[in-house]
């Protein structure tokens, strides 16, 4: 059983982990909100990085991290769909030996976000109403 003070410490430590991994986002003006963190369930989490012009949602499910980009209408779009629309194929990351897409690893998602942040901002704003 996890008591409240242990939960606060785990959440603080987890926040530090996210800020270390995705710290370039806070350097770029984003703030972090951890929506859920379940260390008892495979370490699953959901978190949102928010900036004035874009939101980025991270959802970790059994160590696979999915990244969605917030659109102006309140909907979310998979990062990979936006990248594919501008000619950056999902195949840039190979399949693992057991057939899983290697792009879902947390460190790969962080590198992708850092590399393609401007492209994602542009793609997300292109889908915003004027």
Per-range role (PLM):
Residues 2-21, 32-46, 50-130:
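Intrinsically disordered, low-complexity regulatory regions enriched in serine/threonine/proline
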């Amino acid at each position: 059983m996890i008591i409240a003070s242990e939960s606060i410490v785990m959440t603080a430590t987890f926040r530090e982990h996210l800020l270390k991994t995705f710290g370039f986002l806070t350097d770029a003006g984003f703030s972090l909100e951890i929506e859920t963190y379940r260390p008892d369930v495979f370490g699953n989490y959901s978190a949102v990085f928010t900036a004035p012009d874009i939101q980025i949602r991270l959802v970790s499910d059994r160590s696979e991290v999915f990244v969605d980009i917030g659109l102006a209408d309140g909907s979310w779009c998979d990062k990979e769909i936006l990248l594919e629309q501008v000619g950056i194929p999902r195949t840039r990351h190979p399949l693992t030996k057991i057939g899983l897409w290697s792009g879902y690893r947390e460190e790969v998602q962080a590198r992708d976000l850092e590399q393609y942040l401007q492209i994602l901002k542009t793609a997300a704003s292109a889908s915003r109403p004027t």
